[in-house]
Every structure is written in C-alpha cells, then in structure tokens.
C-alpha cells in the first residue's frame, strides 16, 4: 500500500485493528457532528498564496516552554497507545524524540512513566486527568517529576465521560463486550501477534503501579468511569500548581473567558480542544473557537490547539488562526497502528514536508511569519481586517 498521507494510515489501521480498537480511536460523541466539523472547518480555512519571496532559508523551528522544537508540533496524550502497537507509547515517544518534538504520555497509557521516560533523550510531557482519587493524582505527579517530565498537561474537559455510541456497537462497551473483543482479536492476526501476544502486559501501567495489582481493559473502563470528578473547580487546581515546578498547560479550552481564567490562574499554556469531538457533541470545532481565544489571550499565555489536524497544511492553518503549537492525536495513532515507530516517524516527515510546501507558497519563512495576514478568510466568512481594503478595491 502506498502511504502519502494520514488518510492512508487510517485506511491501513482499519484493516489491521480489531473493530473495537479502531472505532474507539476513530469515533466521537453522540452523532459525531463535532468530530466531523473539526476536520471540515479546518479545511475551509483559505490561505493567501504569495510569490517571488525567496524562500530558500525557510525554517520550521520554534521554541515552547524553553524547549526547542524542530517544528511546532507535539504528540498529544492518547490513552491505550500500547493496545495499538506493541508497547506503543515507547514506539511513539521514540519517533517524536528522533524528530525533535515532544511526546505527551497519557494518564491511561499501557506503558508506565518509568518505562517510557528512559527510552528517549528528550524530557517527555505528562498528561493528568482531574480524578476523585487525589492520592493517585499526587502519586502520578511525583512519579512524573522523578522521571524528569518537563511539562504537565492537565486535562479539564472530562468531568464525566462523553456518550460514545460507536463504543457500544464495536464491542468496547455494551452487552457481551469481552466476548466480542475476543472474537475480533482472533480474526485480526497481525494485531493478535504484535500486540495481543507480544505486547504484554496489557496493564494500565500508571494505574497498576498505584493500585499494586494488574489492571486490564475492564478496569480501565470501570476505574475511569468511577473516578472522573464533576466537582472540580479552579480552586482545586491550586495544589497542583504549587506542587508542579515546570510548565503547566490546561487542556480543553473552547471559550475566551475560560482562557482568561487560565491566565489569571497562572497557567503557562492552554490547549484549545474539544477532546477530538469525543466529549460534548455540538460544541465549536477547535478551528472556529481558536481565533476568539487568540484575540483574548495571545501573548499572555502559550496557545496550543488540537482536534481535526491531519496534515502539515492543517498545522499552518491552525497557527494562522492563532496557535503557537499544535498537538497531533488521531493522525499519529493511525500511523502507530499501521507501522509502529517507523509509521509515526514517516508521518512526521510527511507533515514537515507539507508544512514546508504551505509556507513556501504563502511566503512565510518562519513560524512567526504565519499570522492572520496569511489568511484569505478565516472560516469561509469574514475577511481579516488587514485584507478588507484590498477586498473592497477588487470588488470594483
């Protein structure tokens, strides 16, 4: 199979993975309206093509939280990576490390912090959920600090799990789920050999270490469902801010006022995100939410964004809309499921090449030159102010 884009990896992953795993990563909440809009809205962002700009010295390098990145991309925290490829978190982290970008380890990873951190040279980021069990949260933070994690990504948009209909149909949940998953596994031999037999233990490594016993998929579903905390407020985050020495990023911001609250709280960064359309269906896509948030807090706090990014052109679009850096989620997971570390490495190379093409043809020699002026129109509606006079002149 020829691989030229993330969409090719998606098609390959669908063939390789048991349906319960493919649809768990591919699906969204309710009717998946927001999931679709994440991709569609971003594709509507039109860029200004510029010519004769001497683009021979183009650079994708940027700096975030005093870390040098080869391009403004990091791998997002994704649960259960180790179920998509053998010791998947380690493989993805190695690919990111080699490319010179951060890898973010999820709270609900298969591989524990202590397995992933020593496998790479660059300090990884660690993602933490708001959970009822504050003892677990403190334990996870202590272990992340001990392992040298540089940045904490604190996910706040899951006070309760979203309603994901695909999971019930695919076997991730619903009646006879365990038996359905077993039957799917044995009929997908590549996955069964790579992960089912040789990817063990299939624990939730960070949780198992705390509970002192093995944990499997049923524990993942049950433990998380019982531990999300709907009572959380900014006040509850203060002890985490005091405990964590490094940069702290609040993930799950869609409203400008929440972004301002994050600045007042003292966060170092925010992630404009709707959890990949997996939480509340019908909310704004990240691409639509981003410009207003950037208007509110740009320059006061680092702005990251995720949800709907599938290629290097999408990265450039998100930066033009106001992001400093983006997080890749599903895109890298498709590649990981298809070809492990090599797949993720190839995807990152593709994204870098696509970014260079987009920047060359828009006349942006550096990441700092990708601005609102790079846009013809934001999301198919109003032109940015910088282009309004030109538009009026052309209308005549």
Curated annotation (Swiss-Prot):
Q: Which Gene3D superfamilies match?
A: Aldolase class I
Give a short account of what the protein does.
Catalyzes the conversion of L-lactate to pyruvate. Is coupled to the respiratory chain.
User: Is Repressor there in the keyword field?
Assistant: no
Q: Where is the active site?
A: 275
Q: Which reaction does it catalyse?
A: (S)-lactate + A = pyruvate + AH2
Residues the record lists as binding FMN: 106, 127, 155, 251, 306-330
Q: Which GO terms describe its cellular component?
A: plasma membrane
Which organism encodes this protein?
Shigella boydii serotype 4 (strain Sb227)
Q: Which domain of life is it from?
A: Bacteria
FMN hydroxy acid dehydrogenase domain ranges (all copies): 1-380
Q: Which PANTHER family match?
A: L-LACTATE DEHYDROGENASE (PTHR10578:SF85), S -2-HYDROXY-ACID OXIDASE-RELATED (PTHR10578)
Q: Could you say which EC number(s) this protein's record lists? A: 1.1.-.-
Recite the UniProt keywords alphabetically. Cell inner membrane, Cell membrane, Flavoprotein, FMN, Membrane, Oxidoreductase
Which named protein is this?
L-lactate dehydrogenase
Where is it located? Cell inner membrane
Binding of substrate occurs at 24, 129, 164, 278
Q: Which Pfam families match?
A: FMN_dh
């Amino acid at each position: 199979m020829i691989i030229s884009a993330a969409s090719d990896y998606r098609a390959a992953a669908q063939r390789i993975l048991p349906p319960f795993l493919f649809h768990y990563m591919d699906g969204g909440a309710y009717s998946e309206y927001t999931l679709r809009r994440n991709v569609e809205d971003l594709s509507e962002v039109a860029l200004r093509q510029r010519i004769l700009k001497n683009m021979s010295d183009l650079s994708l390098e940027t700096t975030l939280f005093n870390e040098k990145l080869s391009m403004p991309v990091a791998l997002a925290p994704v649960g259960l990576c180790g179920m998509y490829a053998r010791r998947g978190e380690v493989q993805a982290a190695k690919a990111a490390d080699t490319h010179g970008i951060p890898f973010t380890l999820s709270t609900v990873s298969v591989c524990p912090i202590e397995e992933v951190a020593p496998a790479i040279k660059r300090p990884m980021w660690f993602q933490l959920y708001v959970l009822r069990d504050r003892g677990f949260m403190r334990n996870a933070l202590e272990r992340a600090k001990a392992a040298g994690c540089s940045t904490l990504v604190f996910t706040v948009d899951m006070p309760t799990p979203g309603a994901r209909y695909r999971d019930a149909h695919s076997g991730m949940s619903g009646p006879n789920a365990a038996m359905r998953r077993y039957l799917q596994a044995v009929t997908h031999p590549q996955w069964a050999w790579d992960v089912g037999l040789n990817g063990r233990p299939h624990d939730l490594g960070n949780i198992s270490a705390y509970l002192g016993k093995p944990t499997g998929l049923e524990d993942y579903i049950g433990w998380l469902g019982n531990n999300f905390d709907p009572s959380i407020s900014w006040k509850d985050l203060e002890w985490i801010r005091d405990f964590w020495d490094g940069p702290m990023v609040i993930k799950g911001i869609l409203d400008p006022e929440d972004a301002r609250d994050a600045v007042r709280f003292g966060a170092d960064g925010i992630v404009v995100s709707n959890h990949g359309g997996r939480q509340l269906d019908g909310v704004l896509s990240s691409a639509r939410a981003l410009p207003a948030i950037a208007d509110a807090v740009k320059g006061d706090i680092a702005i990251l964004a995720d949800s709907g990014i599938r290629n290097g052109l999408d990265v450039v679009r998100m930066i033009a809309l106001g992001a400093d850096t983006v997080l890749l989620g599903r895109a890298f997971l498709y590649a990981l499921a298809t070809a492990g570390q090599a797949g993720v490495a190839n995807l990152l190379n593709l994204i870098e090449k696509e970014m260079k093409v987009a920047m060359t043809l828009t006349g942006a020699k550096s990441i700092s030159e990708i601005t609102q002026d790079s846009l013809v129109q934001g999301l198919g509606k109003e032109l940015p102010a910088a282009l309004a006079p030109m538009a009026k002149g052309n209308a005549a």
